[in-house]
UniProtKB/Swiss-Prot annotation:
Pfam families xref list: ATPase_2 (PF01637), MJ1010-like_2nd (PF21690)
GO molecular function annotations of the record: ATP binding; ATP hydrolysis activity
Stated name of the protein: Uncharacterized ATP-binding protein MJ0801
Keywords, ordered alphabetically: ATP-binding, Nucleotide-binding
Binding site for ATP: 29-36
Transmembrane regions listed in the UniProt entry: none
Keyword Glycosyltransferase: no
InterPro entries: AAA+_ATPase, ATPase_dom, MJ1010-like_2nd, P-loop_NTPase, WH-like_DNA-bd_sf
PANTHER family: ATPASE DOMAIN-CONTAINING PROTEIN (PTHR34301:SF8), DNA-BINDING PROTEIN-RELATED (PTHR34301)
Source species, domain of life: Archaea
Length: 379
């Protein structure tokens, strides 16, 4: 399928790339709002060969220690045929003359093995030296971390214990957190050396809230929201998909689709494609019933379990009555100020992918229109 719209976001990111690197950019938004599709469209279709992109996708990794982080970001292979990188000359060829997009930081196998024995800063210094070589060759380096929150719990210590990087969770004394070390390195790349553009993608709004609120990156980071489509854009997207799939959608059909799934690109695409051989209203009702059942099971489990979340130094038990009270706020409103819901409750609902938080605006909303409609139908 051809890429659709997002001209405002595309132009903003291209404008950033035309400037000297000076900030770390966090691209965030609800689940399935199109963050990865957007950044891939830009690096694959909108950039000249003057750029060299290092795209690291943490989505497929379970990272709990330094070794797994190193395995995720570095590669000893030259291409898809798994030919090994022999020496630094081959690395230099890859980063200065090879393809525009690399899905790992190239490193000779012998050097790669050494990284496991050394400090994490040695790995960062190796990457720094590569980025300097890219710049020396006349190209502009771009570093992209997709689903960066996957490393938020990694602790740099000999026991490889796991503690959360969030201030709301309890720390171990003297622990060094990989995320903090990485942020310091990224600040060096952008604010200090002006060497490399850095983009960090995440659908975890609690992670973005942590980054935004701690002040650790104050004056060093900017935030770009990739949200679900607004109604006007969603209706245009339906027209676009109808043409792509040779389907006739009336205005009433499009209004009906929007009333169920809103501007969620993935949901709209599914509905339009399914409508080619199924009844439209049946598709939408099935999706809503599924969302209602999932929400109902979630609430029912609260009759038998006592979930807890950590807030500061306290462990707070979440009660079903408080959850229902919070969700009822969305019966008449799609967006609610986070001040209207206690922190432990909205934290729990975000963790369960029921709510999404925009920390920059302090606004909470359901993760999707389907979830919103499920709340209204069930409560």
């Amino acid at each position: 399928m051809k890429f659709f719209d997002r001209e405002r976001e595309i132009n903003e990111i291209l404008h950033i790339l035309n400037r000297e690197p000076d900030d770390i950019y966090f691209i965030y938004g609800p689940l399935n709002s199109g963050k990865t599709a957007l950044i891939k469209h830009i690096i694959e279709n909108k950039l000249s060969d003057d750029y060299k992109v290092f795209y690291i996708n943490f989505r497929t990794y379970l990272i709990s220690e330094k070794r797994e982080f190193i395995e995720a970001i570095f590669t000893t292979k030259k291409d898809d045929f798994f030919e090994k990188i022999k020496d630094k000359d081959e690395v230099l060829n890859l980063i200065t003359k090879g393809v525009r997009i690399l899905t790992g930081i190239p490193i000779p196998e012998v050097e790669f093995d050494k990284l496991f024995e050394e400090k994490i800063n040695d790995a960062f210094q190796y990457l720094n030296s590569l980025l300097l070589e890219v710049k020396k060759s006349g190209k502009k380096p771009i570093l992209i971390f997709d689903e960066l929150q996957m490393i938020k719990d990694v602790v740099l210590n000999t026991e490889n214990q796991r503690f959360s990087a969030f201030p709301s969770l309890r720390f171990g004394n003297g622990q060094k957190y990989l995320l903090k070390e990485l942020f310091q390195f990224l600040v060096s790349l952008t604010k200090e050396q002006h060497l490399c553009h850095v983009f960090c993608l995440s659908s975890d709004s609690l992670f973005i809230e942590y980054v935004y609120s701690t002040g650790e990156l104050e004056g060093r980071a900017k935030y770009l929201l990739v949200d679900d489509f607004d109604k006007e854009t969603a209706l245009k997207f339906m027209d676009f998909l109808a043409v792509e799939n040779n389907i006739n959608l009336t205005n009433e059909d499009k209004e009906l689709i929007y009333s169920y799934v809103g501007g969620k690109p993935k949901d709209i695409k599914y509905v339009v494609e399914e409508s080619k051989f199924k009844d439209l209203r049946e598709i939408l009702e099935f999706m809503l019933k599924d969302a209602v059942q999932k929400l109902d099971m979630f609430l029912d489990m609260l009759n038998y379990s006592k979930p807890k979340v950590d807030v500061g130094d306290e462990v707070i038990e979440i009660k079903k009555d408080n959850v229902i009270e919070a969700l009822k706020l969305f019966k008449d409103e799609y967006e609610v100020s986070k001040k209207h819901i206690p922190v432990p409750v909205y934290t729990y609902l975000i963790k369960r992918n029921i709510l999404f938080l925009n920390p920059i605006e302090g606004i909470l909303k359901p993760q999707s229109y389907l979830v919103w409609n499920a709340i209204k139908r069930l409560l």
